[in-house]
Amino acid sequence: LAAAKRILRNPCGGARASVTTLYKTMTPKQLKPIMPEIIESIRKPGWSVMFSNNVREKGLVFLAENGISEGLDELMKIIEPDPARENEGYWFAPRVIKYFKHYRGAAKAQLPKLRQYQEAYKTSRMLSKNERFLKEMTKILDLIKKDANPPNLRSWKTL
């Protein structure tokens, strides 16, 4: 794990990508020592955009599938429709919106903000015509709202 930690700190997205295979073969508890680096690799893309977005997405999937609460926080940050980073938030949102399905009702506290994001997407230059994404977002919001049995999320720090 020491090598994986160093690789995830590498600014090259291509190098970071080599670590993502661990997400499929190890448990969150086993990866706890490198969890800060996993989260940081989601937050800050490497300079190789082609690979770094894939690394970020795989990190989000790992956290979502394992009910890690920090993953929901990162997902909210990534899909924020911030015009200052339009090529990231607007472009990346259609790729990652589906991961809210793992959080379902545990994301209810985020519904007001998600509705604001949805309205912003409807008027954005980049996503206003992306009907598939807008429909998917509506389905996700309905799923979150109607979920009567939300999953129990846990922080990676308590693993």
Outline where the language-model segments fall:
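Eukaryotic acidic, Ser/Thr-rich intrinsically disordered low-complexity regions
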Residues: 115-118, 122-159
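Structural detector for internal amphipathic alpha-helices that build alpha-solenoid repeat scaffolds
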Residues: 6-9, 13-29, 49-68, 87-106, ...
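Amphipathic alpha-helical scaffolding segments comprising HEAT/armadillo-like alpha-solenoid repeats
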Residues: 1-9, 28-45, 68-82, 105-119, ...
